[in-house]
Amino acid sequence: LVGTVYGSAMLVAETLCDHLQADGHVCQIFDDAALTDIDASRVLLIVTATTGQGDIPPNLQSFASALADRAPYMKGWRYALIAMGDSSYEHFCGAGRSLDALLQELAAEPLVVHLEIDATVEDEPEVAALAWLKTWENRL
């Protein structure tokens, strides 16, 4: 599941999906998903940029709103999350942090501590994301 504004989060998601498929996993990228599109029996990997004042990107807003409004009980759901942002802004990685908190509040289980990628440090966020994925991929 990808929340993107300028394409960096999509590049990260595509890199991770390519790697997972090469390792024999089934992977599908959603950039405009509804809550009903997500199969709760599979691991949900979220890659999201942060926009504005720590906001969720527009293409991920409906998914996040559905989570917040419907507050479904998500016990049994497993997920991993990458939050992307720029640490020179006050609400660094705000979108990812808020989604992570919401998912945990709804009883979803994080497979790993979320990754925060800082655009002021990482010139190639997909490289950092791939290294992170490799540390926990064996849990899939």
Regions inferred by a protein language model and the residue ranges of each:
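FMN-binding flavodoxin-like domain, especially the glycine-rich phosphate-binding loop
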Residues: 2, 6-14, 18-30, 40-44, ...
